[in-house]
């Protein structure tokens, strides 16, 4: 690494227009990772770069890419139609768009009259197809492609696209690209490229990819690792707050309303949680329970691409105090300069994501703070777990919660206005349990020790759902009667949807279900009656059969006796009276036998 971080100390001369761009964009000096990476990658070295979030990794590969395009004469007409020079792969559309923005910012300083350097963004969207992308590529002939794995792979498979001129491949957030979600697509893309290309892997946690890096086809790579005792940048304070689950929303509102910040990102565990809590915060704002100067935005992975990009742009350009509720779709690489506060309602499933979340604040040596909420109990072991990964977090015990009076009642009253909100609350709760069960640190985040009632109260639930987790891990004594968390229970039959069409459909479905139930009941009764009649018939038939069998048996015995009897004419008919008299006489004679001499 160069002893000085001045741009003038690079051991080769930057293109004059790039040097002008660097000064104009406010990069007064290089960061350590830029000073180490730019000379290596610009001079035909494969690199594996690991550095803390916000350390300038994007510029560290954009400058060498632009330098290489010029060095390889790819900015001339020698680059054939259908060919390209560099491919940059990113795990998310937002990050790909941001990289494209950095490249375009540099290219605004490219001298007029030169053969233009161009880049093209390739991400899935609802407004353009792969064929549209191919048509634009063939028309504008860009040298640099920036995109997400799925769309890039579809693009490269098109017959008009040729990969033989590709001289460089960049994997930004490489550890994410090499995990099971993207691994297959990324490997396929890299196999389609020339083996002699240069490859660069960049991430704050690239070491977590392990042996996967060898699947990228690098040749004698140089590892650039900016060593620090703490993986977080020095300008970023990472804190945690231990709290009862039921008080988490009150804590969030206290920080949003009272903490000094310009822009804040709130990370929630699931997409459905983002929409749910965004609606709650909007409702509280209407009731003047939120800072009146606060603007709320929401972003998650299930939104259409255009909607996501517009939301991110509006949040970035917002001049006042603003909060973005989001999922991990905005955890990696997103660089919004004014973010100085990051709040995590729950730790992420993967500990590596924790650092990426925190790194949205404190970028480019600007002061920032990241706070994670931990449930009381076993979750407190998460802090020593982070220390093993060189992430230091300090407890923030100076925050005094300023509770909004009657908040649980406000949320429940809001839910009771519309059955759809009731359904939504149950789905959010169930989704959270699924999320919690997938934590990689399963010895810390255990369903057996979760405060199910407290979590339900934080979500504003009116009734506990009958999930397997609750049935398995919550004692029967702890489960309220029929799961109701309010008293008295509400009448679900009369609980209506605010949307007339949806309510009409519910009533129709209810009537159809009742008709089916009544019909099934009638069928059951008829079946029972039919079974009773048939059983009687069978019993009667069985008796008749037994009688017939007995009669036949008796007849057979009588016939056999007749056959065995003596029918001769000499047979003497016996008089039963004579037999009786003879027996009596015999008895008398037997009593008088003997001689007087025997006495």
UniProtKB/Swiss-Prot annotation:
Motif Q motif mapped to chain: 7-35
Motif DEAD box in this chain: 172-175
Residues at which ATP binds: 51-58
Region (Disordered): 559-599
Chain ranges of the Helicase C-terminal domain: 248-415
Coiled-coil regions listed in the entry: 501-561
Biased composition (Acidic residues): 564-573
E.C. code: 3.6.4.13
SMART domains: DEXDc, DUF4217, HELICc
Record-annotated Helicase ATP-binding domain positions: 38-224
One GO term describing the cellular component: nucleolus
Subcellular location per the Swiss-Prot or TrEMBL entry: Nucleus, Nucleolus
Family: Belongs to the DEAD box helicase family. DDX55/SPB4 subfamily.
Quaternary structure note: Component of pre-60S ribosomal complexes.
Record comment regarding domains: The Q motif is unique to and characteristic of the DEAD box family of RNA helicases and controls ATP binding and hydrolysis.
Name of the protein in its database record: ATP-dependent rRNA helicase SPB4
Natural source organism: Eremothecium gossypii (strain ATCC 10895 / CBS 109.51 / FGSC 9923 / NRRL Y-1056) (Yeast)
Gene: SPB4
């Amino acid at each position: 690494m160069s002893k000085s971080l001045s741009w003038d100390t690079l051991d080769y001369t930057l293109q004059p227009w790039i040097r002008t761009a660097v000064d104009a964009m406010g990069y007064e000096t290089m960061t350590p990772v830029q000073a180490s990476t730019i000379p290596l990658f610009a001079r035909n070295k494969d690199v594996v770069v690991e550095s803390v979030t916000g350390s300038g990794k994007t510029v560290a590969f954009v400058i060498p890419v632009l330098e290489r395009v010029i060095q390889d004469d790819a900015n001339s007409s020698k680059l054939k139609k259908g060919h390209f020079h560099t491919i940059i792969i990113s795990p998310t559309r937002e990050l790909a768009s941001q990289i494209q923005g950095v490249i375009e910012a540099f290219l605004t300083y490219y001298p007029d009259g030169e053969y233009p350097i161009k880049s093209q963004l390739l991400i899935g969207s609802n407004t353009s197809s792969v064929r549209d992308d191919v048509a634009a590529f063939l028309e504008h002939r860009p040298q640099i492609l920036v995109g997400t794995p799925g769309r890039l792979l579809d693009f490269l498979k098109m017959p008009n696209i040729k990969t033989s001129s590709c001289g460089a491949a960049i994997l930004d957030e490489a550890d994410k690209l090499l995990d099971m979600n993207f691994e297959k697509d990324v490997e396929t893309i890299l196999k389609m490229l020339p083996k002699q290309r240069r490859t660069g892997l960049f991430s704050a946690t690239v070491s977590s990819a392990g042996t996967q890096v060898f699947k990228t086809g690098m040749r004698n790579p140089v590892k650039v690792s900016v060593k620090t005792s703490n993986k977080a940048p020095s300008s970023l304070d990472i804190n945690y707050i231990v709290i009862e689950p039921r008080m988490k929303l009150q804590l969030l509102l206290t920080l949003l309303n009272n903490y000094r910040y310009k822009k804040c990102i709130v990370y929630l565990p699931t997409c459905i949680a983002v929409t749910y809590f965004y609606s709650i915060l909007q409702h509280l704002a209407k009731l003047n329970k939120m800072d009146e100067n606060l603007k709320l935005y929401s972003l998650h992975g299930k939104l259409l691409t255009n909607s996501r990009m517009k939301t991110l742009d509006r949040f970035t350009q917002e001049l006042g105090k603003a909060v973005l509720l989001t999922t991990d779709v905005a955890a990696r690489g997103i660089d919004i300069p004014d973010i100085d506060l990051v709040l995590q309602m729950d730790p992420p499933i993967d500990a590596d994501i924790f650092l990426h979340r925190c790194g949205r604040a404190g970028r480019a040596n600007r002061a920032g703070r990241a706070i994670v909420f931990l449930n009381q109990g076993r979750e407190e072991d998460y802090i020593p777990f982070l220390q093993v990964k060189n992430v230091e977090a300090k407890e923030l015990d100076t925050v005094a919660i300023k509770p909004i009076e009657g908040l649980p009642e406000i949320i429940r009253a809001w839910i009771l206005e519309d059955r759809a909100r009731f359904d939504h609350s149950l789905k959010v709760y169930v989704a959270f349990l699924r999320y919690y069960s997938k934590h990689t640190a399963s010895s810390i985040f255990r369903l057996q020790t979760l405060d199910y009632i407290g979590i339900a109260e934080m979500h504003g639930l009116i009734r506990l759902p009958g999930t397997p987790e609750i049935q398995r891990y919550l004692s029967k004594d702890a489960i309220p009667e029929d799961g109701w968390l309010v008293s008295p229970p509400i009448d679900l039959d009369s609980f209506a949807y605010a949307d007339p069409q949806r309510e009409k459909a519910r009533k129709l479905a209810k009537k159809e279900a009742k008709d089916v139930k009544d019909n099934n009941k009638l069928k059951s009764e008829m079946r029972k009656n039919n079974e009773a009649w048939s059983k009687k018939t069978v019993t009667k038939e069985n008796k008749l059969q037994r009688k017939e069998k007995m009669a036949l048996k008796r007849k057979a015995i009588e016939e056999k006796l007749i056959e065995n009897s003596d029918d001769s004419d000499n047979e003497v008919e016996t008089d039963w009276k004579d037999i009786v008299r003879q027996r009596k006489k015999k008895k008398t004679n037997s009593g008088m036998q003997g001689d007087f001499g025997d006495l």
